[in-house]
């Protein structure tokens, strides 16, 4: 898979591409990361990429032309194009699975007050990582890309994400423990130590449901609604 990041701050992506699993995936040629500074595609002599809002308003808007020209520089205009925006649909695990099937994805990260609305006509969809506002779209782009990349074959072992939160039944993951068995009065549940796999599996299923009900009751409500 090829992933393009259109941004005004290309250095933001250095730690993301140079460390851990993402770096290994790049090294093993499982993914190709391309960072594009769309400021370089401005026709303004000062490389200006923003301007005042028609009709008045706070802040400056990113112009459509530099972004459109940057997309023109990419193979197939960047494949499946995503505008990172707090106004977009909220990204989730199901969307990550869908996007992991594409050969090429492009994330467009904004700054300032946002984009000229016509930029939305250049992309396939707008995505958000939640109902809050950040200083720019770079962090959400990396969050979504990380979630997508780990689902690509051979990036991590299939077993590592097969039973994670939001997979399978859609519930959160069950609680897990390691040594020591007891710490400051906090003990590992006895059922996990008795070696009875049927009882352990039963406990895990019940614990998943309880944890999801406590932390994400909206998931339980959605599952019940879909039945």
UniProtKB/Swiss-Prot annotation:
Its main location: cytoplasm. One of its GO terms (cellular component) is cytosol. The keyword S-adenosyl-L-methionine applies. It comes from the Bacteria. Pfam families: tRNA_m1G_MT. Keywords: Cytoplasm, Methyltransferase, S-adenosyl-L-methionine, Transferase, tRNA processing. It catalyses: guanosine(37) in tRNA + S-adenosyl-L-methionine = N(1)-methylguanosine(37) in tRNA + S-adenosyl-L-homocysteine + H(+). S-adenosyl-L-methionine binds at residues 110, 129-134. One of its GO terms (molecular function) is tRNA (guanine(37)-N1)-methyltransferase activity. Its EC number is 2.1.1.228. One of its GO terms (biological process) is tRNA N1-guanine methylation. It is found in: Cytoplasm. Specifically methylates guanosine-37 in various tRNAs. Homodimer. Belongs to the RNA methyltransferase TrmD family. This is tRNA (guanine-N(1)-)-methyltransferase. It comes from Mycoplasmopsis agalactiae (strain NCTC 10123 / CIP 59.7 / PG2) (Mycoplasma agalactiae). The gene is trmD.
